[in-house]
């Protein structure tokens, strides 16, 4: 074989160029590197010369670890101010990392290792980390600490980012946040340029040696480095060269220059090894030895290169490089001698002895065996073709004793000369020239099959060189990968041992008895306290005695007369007889028939005196509303003659609602809300203590009532002694009957007076209302036009036809049908063009005036009830009536607005009878249909519109949609006018419109989210929610159920693999609130601020205490703004509540003054207080005790203002409960600083606007808003919002993803924060710590968390963020 010399004008070292190119190249994870085995240590171009090696690397490269780019995320970190930065204090960061590592040590056996883990997978993981430029020792440590415990590539990467110091992290993983600027690199000051003429290799090296000898102060190391750096003047100028020039540079690899560079590095490594040995630094010695071994292995491979020149070898290095193992560092008394030439002179005989023998060969061939070109001629022809402007190759004979070698010089260009000389000698000088030509072709045509065009003898030596080069590469590859392979083998053995140990442990555990679950550890007393069960089976004789005494009382006898006047009383015996023959019946009674009070009494009396068996006289009557349960129980107690009221000592009737229970030992008839009965089902799935269940108002089709019907139908199949009565106020009874196998229907007429009904056409005709063409209630798109065809005749008799729309002549209106012929043209015009989707307030005003001036109605005593769809319509009509002079006389008119958001004082006046001669006008929504009864209503004005809460699958949000009412609702509204006398109903829609109405409204189960319902299904072990709800009266869509289950899994209430509740889900099912609010309550208890969080939860489940009186909206908004704090509606409400609590001890007058000043509803505040106490009781009953000391360290008491730290903690818990209801504020900079722009927020489903009632309605800042609900009116609005910081989202939000190179931290793929990788990993690990604490607490609710280090450090972290 032979050696090669090359020179060019730049003289740059190929190795240095390769290293520079690798450093300047962007570090993309998917970029293949030559060799692919040890890219972190060896990025030399040595392997790039070998095509087969490169191909093998590309085909069998490791799995890549991909990093998303900024373009993928759509975020420019350094320029987008909306991407907030996340920073943790340095001291706190160290403490958190220490806590994370300590927790991992204590829980190191929790990981599950895959049984299919192979050495190939471990090798892929190792190489993936290696490609990210992590050091081998760090990779091994990371894999040892993660793979053994079930970790993968991401776990190993997280471990590295968390535990390595910042200066040990590769580029792109640095902790520094500042944008790195491009720095100008200092150029190497080159020595005087050498002559460009090509000199022979030996002569050139001899000159270098002479130069060295002439300067005794110049050490061998300096000479080596100088040799390697010669011609590197313009290294930096080559950064922008084209790709093809880079490839050409890599092809010009000179093993001699690389050998010298490695020699210098080897000497450095030895010096470092000596120093570390003196310092007794074992780790440093190990690292130095590894480097020495690597340098020697590569130097040995270079010595076998065909172009290697032995003259560059140093005797000391050469002798040691032949040793199979790296030499140990020299001892202290034998310092390293860098004057290698002096040693060389002192031992000439030793050098002569080590001179290798000559390789003598004969390459003779006959003209018969080869008729083609000779190698020399082939080389000349090849150079003429490829270097046409250069002279032919020149051959120089080199005598070696009696043998010959030949040196061939090829001038590729004026600054690029190639000179090669084989080490093989021949007896013939011509054969030597052919051999030199063959070697030159071998170097010039890498990867080509040129050897097939050469004579056989030279073809064989070509193949010999090629095989030797491949063998060296393979050996080098094996040697370089040997430490990695040894480590992987050891790690795999450890994994196998660990798996065997786990199998033996699991078998042992299976033999042991399992521990009781958290459910079995619950206290019986607490369960009874949470869900009292008043209906206890016992002897009925004492109950009969009580009933007999009650029937003898004067109150019972007096009210019996009133009961006998009710329509249902006459059907009492028939109802009882039918129920004895059938276990299920449907009672259809109109409003006022008395079914809700009388049917339960019929059953009670019959069970007590006509065959009721002991323990089987327990009647439960469900109501959809709390006020209905309370009022009905009170009325029934009076009719039964009980003086003590519901739940009294001798009372047979009681009630139970969410926050109140009035029952006693004698209670045998219980009125309760539907939700209470559902919670009883969680304790007793068969309702064994109940004999009769009455479900009232089933026509309302609430979610709870439909759910209850599914369960009751299942129970009826299993219990033959249970009876069910369904009571409805409408005629929609066939559907209920068919659902329960066509059970009997008993119809009862109501006790109502006749009601005369007028439709839109009658109202317009009677009032003489004129619909102006420019009125806002006139449909502009239905202009009085008609289509005509015009025929236009042109020149030459040609004609063209045009279609035009022209105003129609008066009297040519469309025919509305025969029923409208008796109405005037003015009425027909109004009916035709009036917009049916907009309530005509002008017409309502005219109608009220008509009722006052018409002789037929003027003297009719009674109130006017106007049904409107929402608060905005109520307020608008209220303003119109208040500003009209005709209604200024307070002695004649009393105007009342009735809505749940308005003050209770106005609503209370609706139930008070006004003085004679005063007409009461009540503006209300559909709450007045069945929820409340205004006793003196005679006139009803029905706008025919309502607002329904509907769930939109596309946007996954609920919205209030204004729509037409159903026929059932229209009849209910009509019936309100016939309670006391003959009434009148004015419908602001035509008769045709009424006939087109749906018979009934869409059931609520088809319109709302189903999370709470799914919780109850799983809590009661009723199977899969999808399967269970398919049995409903109207089954919801599977996608809606799937969305509900997805949310439950996201908040951790349900297991991922099966419909089974987690400990968190078990507790959420016991809390009568939305699942997100329930989670917030539990987090509040765990973090020691249950009182404050329960207050916020109460405001979310009820209504805001802030009120807006009619005509005082501006003042009310100003009062709320003055109380605003922390850019949060929730904290503002809490502040108002704290102020009210502080002022209460001063008396009622001070309390009312505070409420009036701040536009607060005192009743709402009292309700919030009651609900808060109930929620706290429920949470504590589940075992989440919150001692006073913990509360004191959490949030302030009611008498104290909130601090900034406490506000941060409260916001964090709000985020834990309400996430993923978050949105990004779209900051808009206003030109006019006085202008207030609406706050627009980008949510996961699209843009939305903060509701005008929020304190953040005009907030303009970079940040994120948490919102309680998203509703759709004319726009999509966010109600009850709070500005939150990054920490709560990162701690309690969705899945975290890290974009290392961009320093981006992403939550749920759309929420972005700027953060170094280490901080990102910290938050990922904190999530694991939080989950571990929650799991322990939820499985053992009585466990104290007062001194828990994890919770304390998380609270400290939250409170440090501003």
UniProtKB/Swiss-Prot annotation:
Acidic residues bias spans: 231-242
Look up keyword Nucleotide-binding and say if it applies.
yes
SUPFAM superfamilies, alphabetically? Answer: P-loop containing nucleoside triphosphate hydrolases
Task: Enumerate composition-biased segments (Basic and acidic residues).
Answer: 28-41, 243-257
Q: What is this protein called?
A: ATP-dependent RNA helicase dhx29
Q: What's any GO biological process attached to this entry?
A: positive regulation of translational initiation
Q: Can the keyword Coiled coil be found in this entry's annotation?
A: yes
Q: Which residues bind ATP?
A: 589-596
């Amino acid at each position: 074989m032979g050696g090669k010399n090359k020179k060019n004008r730049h003289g740059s070292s190929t190795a240095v160029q390769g290293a520079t190119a690798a450093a300047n190249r962007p570090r993309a994870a998917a970029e293949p590197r030559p060799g692919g085995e040890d890219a972190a240590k060896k990025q030399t171009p040595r392997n790039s010369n070998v095509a087969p090696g490169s191909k093998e690397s590309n085909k069998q490269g490791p799995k890549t670890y991909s990093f998303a780019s900024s373009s993928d995320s759509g975020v420019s970190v350094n320029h987008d101010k909306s991407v907030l930065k996340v920073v943790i204090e340095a001291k706190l960061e160290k403490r958190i990392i220490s806590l994370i590592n300590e927790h991992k040590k204590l829980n190191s056996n929790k990981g599950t290792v895959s049984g299919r883990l192979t050495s190939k997978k471990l090798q892929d993981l190792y190489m993936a980390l290696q490609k990210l430029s992590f050091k081998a020792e760090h990779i091994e440590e990371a894999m040892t600490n993660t793979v053994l415990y079930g970790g993968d590539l991401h776990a190993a990467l997280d471990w590295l980012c968390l535990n390595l110091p910042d200066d040990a992290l590769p580029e792109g993983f640095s902790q520094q946040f500042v944008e790195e600027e491009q720095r100008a690199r200092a150029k190497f000051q080159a020595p005087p340029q050498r002559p460009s003429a090509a000199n022979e290799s030996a002569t050139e090296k001899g000159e270098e040696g002479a130069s060295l000898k002439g300067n005794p102060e110049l050490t061998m190391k300096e000479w080596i480095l100088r040799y390697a750096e010669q011609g590197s003047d313009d290294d930096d100028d080559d950064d922008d060269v084209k790709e093809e020039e880079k490839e050409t540079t890599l092809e010009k690899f000179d093993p001699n220059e690389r050998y010298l560079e490695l020699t210098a590095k080897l000497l450095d490594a030895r010096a470092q090894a000596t120093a570390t040995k003196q310092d007794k630094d074992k780790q440093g010695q190990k690292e130095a030895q590894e480097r020495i071994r690597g340098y020697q292995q590569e130097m040995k491979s270079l010595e076998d290169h065909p172009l290697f020149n032995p003259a560059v070898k140093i005797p000391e290095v050469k002798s040691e490089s032949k040793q199979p193992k790296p030499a140990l560092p020299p001892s202290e008394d034998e310092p390293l001698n860098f004057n290698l030439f002096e040693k060389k002179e002192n031992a000439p005989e030793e050098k002569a002895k080590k001179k290798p023998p000559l390789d003598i060969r004969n390459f003779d061939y006959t003209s018969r065996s080869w008729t083609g070109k000779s190698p020399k001629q082939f080389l000349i022809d090849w150079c003429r073709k490829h270097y046409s402007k250069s002279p032919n190759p020149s051959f120089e004979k080199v005598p070696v004793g009696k043998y010959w070698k030949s040196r061939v010089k090829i001038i590729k260009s004026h600054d690029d000369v190639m000179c090669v000389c084989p080490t093989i000698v021949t007896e013939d000088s011509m054969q030597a020239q052919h051999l030199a030509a063959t070697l030159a072709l071998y170097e010039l045509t890498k990867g080509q099959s040129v050897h097939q065009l050469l004579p056989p003898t030279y073809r064989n030596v070509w193949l010999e060189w090629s095989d030797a080069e491949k063998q060296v590469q393979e050996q080098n590859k094996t040697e370089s990968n040997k430490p990695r392979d040894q480590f992987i083998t050891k790690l795999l053995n450890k994994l196998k041992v660990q798996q065997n140990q786990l199998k033996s442990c699991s078998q042992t555990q299976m033999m042991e008895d399992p521990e009781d679950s958290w459910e079995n550890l619950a206290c019986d007393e607490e369960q009874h306290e949470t869900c009292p069960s008043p209906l206890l089976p016992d002897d009925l004789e004492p109950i009969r005695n009580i009933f007999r005494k009650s029937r003898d009382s004067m109150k019972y006898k007096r009210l019996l007369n009133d009961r006998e006047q009710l329509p249902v009383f006459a059907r009492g015996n028939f109802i009882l007889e039918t129920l004895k023959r059938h276990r299920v019946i449907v009672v259809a009674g109109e409003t006022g028939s008395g079914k809700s009070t009388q049917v339960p009494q019929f059953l009670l009396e019959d069970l007590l005196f006509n065959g009721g068996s002991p323990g089987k006289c327990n009647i439960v009557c469900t109501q959809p509303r709390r006020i209905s349960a309370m009022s009905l129980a009170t009325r029934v107690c009076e009719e039964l003659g009980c003086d003590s009221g519901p739940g009294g000592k001798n009372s047979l009737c009681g009630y139970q609602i969410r926050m109140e229970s009035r029952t006693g030992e004698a209670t045998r008839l219980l009125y309760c809300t539907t939700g209470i009965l559902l919670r009883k089902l969680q304790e007793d799935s068969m309702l064994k203590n109940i004999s009769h269940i009455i479900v009232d108002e089933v026509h309302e089709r609430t979610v709870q009532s439909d759910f209850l019907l599914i369960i009751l139908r299942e129970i009826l199949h299993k219990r033959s002694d249970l009876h069910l009565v369904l009571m409805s106020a409408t005629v929609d009874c066939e559907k209920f009957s068919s659902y329960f196998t066509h059970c009997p229907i008993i119809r009862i007429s109501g006790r109502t007076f006749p009601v005369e009904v007028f439709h839109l056409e009658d109202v317009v005709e009677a009032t003489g209302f004129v619909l102006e063409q420019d009125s806002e209630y006139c449909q502009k798109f239905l202009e009085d036009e008609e289509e005509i065809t015009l025929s236009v005749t042109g020149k030459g008799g040609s004609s063209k036809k045009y279609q035009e729309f022209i105003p129609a002549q008066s009297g040519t209106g469309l025919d509305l049908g025969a029923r409208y012929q008796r109405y005037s043209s003015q009425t027909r015009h109004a009916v035709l063009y009036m917009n049916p989707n907009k309530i005509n307030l002008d017409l309502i005003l005219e109608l009220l005036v008509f009722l006052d001036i018409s002789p037929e109605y003027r003297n009719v005593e009674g109130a006017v009830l106007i049904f409107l769809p929402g608060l905005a319509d109520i307020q608008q009509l209220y303003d119109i009536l208040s500003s009209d002079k005709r209604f200024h006389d307070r002695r004649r008119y009393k105007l009342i607005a009735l809505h749940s958001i308005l003050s209770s004082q106005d609503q209370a006046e609706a139930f008070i009878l006004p003085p004679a001669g005063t007409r009461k006008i009540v503006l209300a929504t559909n709450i007045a249909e069945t929820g409340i009864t205004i006793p003196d209503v005679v006139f009803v004005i029905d706008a025919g519109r309502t607002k329904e809460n509907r769930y939109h699958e596309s946007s996954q949000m609920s919205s209030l949609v204004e729509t037409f009412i159903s026929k059932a609702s229209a009849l209910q509204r009509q019936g309100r006018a016939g309670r006391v006398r003959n009434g009148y109903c004015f419908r602001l829609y035509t008769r045709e419109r009424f006939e087109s109405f749906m018979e009934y409204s869409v059931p609520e189960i088809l319109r709302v989210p189903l999370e709470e319902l799914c919780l109850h299904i799983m809590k009661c072990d009723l199977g899969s929610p999808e399967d269970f709800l398919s049995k409903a009266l109207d089954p919801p869509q599977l996608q809606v159920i799937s969305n509900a289950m997805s949310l439950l899994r996201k908040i951790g209430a349900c297991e991922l693999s099966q419909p089974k509740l987690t400990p968190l889900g078990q507790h959420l099912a016991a809390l009568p609130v939305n699942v997100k609010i329930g989670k917030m309550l539990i987090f509040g208890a765990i973090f020691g601020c249950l009182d404050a969080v329960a207050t916020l939860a109460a405001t979310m489940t009820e209504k805001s205490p802030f009120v807006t009186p009619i005509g005082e909206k501006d003042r009310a908004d100003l009062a709320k703004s003055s109380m605003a704090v922390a850019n949060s509606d929730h904290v503002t409400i809490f502040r108002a509540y704290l102020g009210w609590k502080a002022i209460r001890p001063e008396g009622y007058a001070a309390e009312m003054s505070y409420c009036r000043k701040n536009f607060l509803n005192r009743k709402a505040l009292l309700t919030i207080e009651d609900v808060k106490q109930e929620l706290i009781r429920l949470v504590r009953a589940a075992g989440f005790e919150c001692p006073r000391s913990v509360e004191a360290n959490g949030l302030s008491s009611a008498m104290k203002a909130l601090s900034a730290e406490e506000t941060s903690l409260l916001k964090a818990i709000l985020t834990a409960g309400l996430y993923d209801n978050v949105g990004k504020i779209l900051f808009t900079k206003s030109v006019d600083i006085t202008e207030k722009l609406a706050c627009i927020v980008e949510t996961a489903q699209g843009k939305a606007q903060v509701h005008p009632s929020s304190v953040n309605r005009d907030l303009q800042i970079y940040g994120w808003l948490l919102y309680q609900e998203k509703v759709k009116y004319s726009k999509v609005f966010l109600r009850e919002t709070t500005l939150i910081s990054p920490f709560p989202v990162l701690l309690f939000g969705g899945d975290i993803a890290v974009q290392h190179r961009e320093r981006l931290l992403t939550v749920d793929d759309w929420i972005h924060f700027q953060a170094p990788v280490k901080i990102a990993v910290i938050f990922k690990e904190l999530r694991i710590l939080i989950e571990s604490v929650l799991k322990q607490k939820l499985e053992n609710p009585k466990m104290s968390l007062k001194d828990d280090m994890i919770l304390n450090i998380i609270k400290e972290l939250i409170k440090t963020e501003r």
